[in-house]
Amino acid sequence: HMKLAVSATMIALAILAGCAPKAAAPGDAPAAAPDTAQPATDALQQAIGSDLRSPAEKARDVWRHPKETLDFFGVKPDQTVIEIWPGGGWYTNILAPWLASGGGKLVLAVFDPAAAPDDERRARTETLNEEFKANYADPKFGTLEYTVFSSVSGPLVAPGSADAILTFRNIHNWMAGGYEQKFFNDAFAALKPGGVLGVVEHRLPSTGTQDPSASSGYVHEDYVKALAANAGFEFDGESEINANPDDTADHPYGVWTLPPVSRQPGEDEIPPDGWDPAKYQAIGESDRMTLKFIKPAE
């Protein structure tokens, strides 16, 4: 329950800080030899099934497909991986023990106190970051490293030092702040040549109109691809593993109408026409794009 509480607080803080006004293919690399591939897969399954994850987190695997997603991105347990804005740590709880077991390294880019608009919110961001780090003090998570990402942050890590950079359901937050291109530029600089950028994001159908600040939480796939191309990335493929054809991406409270947030009308609010919470529970979690980009080899 602690993790869930921290997650909710971080989202609330992000709203206050103006970070998130509304919230929370085949590669060219040769296949690993069977004797090395199998233990890596087993170790990932072990991390996914581990008691470091809460039952509530595991219940979302059916929507978030962590094994298939990480396999698609081609992440290996001996790599240096950066997770950008880990939020409540849903993916961190899988990545940290898995990379620890394989001799890899996980770097977490958390909220940036320097981007907070005032001293009070800066202090609150610092406190949240300390609470987040305290959650990962258990040696089972390995030795984690920390950096920050924001509209004003410097390099994520030493240039050209990361094998993979991952971010899950965050692009809309950076669009809201107007610094989405900076994310792709910073990721490009941090990756080794041949390194992978893996993005999962709520998908707005191409027929829908893209709000530049993504106030619904949904984003056009073509826009994400353009941001990556602008930064120098090659598009390497996409997967439909996190798709949900039942999601029309057109809901009264945007993506937050759906689980896991399942936003409800406020006490003094007149519910939207035909409001039926059961309908949104039945849809499930959002339709998501899963995109893989590569930093070209030099």
Feature-to-residue mapping (PLM):
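A short acidic, Gly/Pro-enriched loop at the edge of an enzyme's catalytic core
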Residues: 154-165
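C-terminal lobe and adjacent flexible extensions of AdoMet/dcAdoMet transferase-like proteins
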Residues: 273-298
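A short glycine-rich, Lys/Arg-flanked "PGG" loop and its adjoining helix->strand segment in the class I
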Residues: 96-100, 180-193
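Conserved class I S-adenosyl-L-methionine
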Residues: 77-87
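A short, conserved alpha-helix within the catalytic core of class I
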Residues: 149-152, 173-186
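C-terminal motif of bacterial Sec signal peptides marking the signal peptidase cleavage site
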Residues: 15-18
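Conserved beta-strand signature within the Rossmann-like core of class I S-adenosyl-L-methionine
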Residues: 106-109, 194-202
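Bacterial signal peptide processing site
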Residues: 20-22
